[in-house]
Regions:
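Glycine-rich beta-strand-turn "strand-cap" elements at beta-sheet edges
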Residues: 1-4, 42-53, 79-97
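Short, well-ordered beta-strand segments in beta-rich or mixed alpha/beta enzyme
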Residues: 3-11, 42-73
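Short amphipathic alpha-helical segments
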Residues: 15-43, 75-83
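Short, surface-exposed, polar/charged, turn-prone segments marking secondary-structure boundaries
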Residues: 33-38, 59-61, 67-72, 82-89, ...
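A generic signature of intrinsically disordered, low-complexity regions enriched in glycine/proline
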Residues: 12, 19-23, 61, 96
């Protein structure tokens, strides 16, 4: 079975320090880890200080339906309130090198 890849870049404001963002992301990651269909997640931080997206989350889900159910839940919606601008999208792998 193939998994689907979530790529979610975050536009973290300059006045928000990394620790504050990481704390919120950690709570959301713990919740997602408990949801059906979640496979794994990795959070990446930009090396360049001028990057538009300071953090990018890359996660795997068993299906788009599992992901949608997780993000539409009232628990996740409450956690996501106040999250910096982000642009989540699901992808499927089409080539591997």
């Amino acid at each position: 079975m193939k998994n689907f890849v979530l790529i979610n870049p975050f536009e973290v404001p300059e006045d928000m320090d990394d620790d504050r963002f990481l704390e919120g992301w950690g709570r959301a990651a713990d919740y997602m880890r408990s949801r059906p269909g979640f496979v794994a997640s990795r959070l990446h931080r930009a090396v360049s200080p001028n990057s538009r997206f300071r953090f990018v989350n890359v996660a795997e889900w068993e299906s788009p339906q599992y992901f949608q159910a997780a993000v539409r839940s009232p628990e996740f919606q409450a956690m996501a309130a106040g999250t910096p601008s982000n642009y989540p999208a699901l992808y499927e792998v089409v080539r591997v090198v």
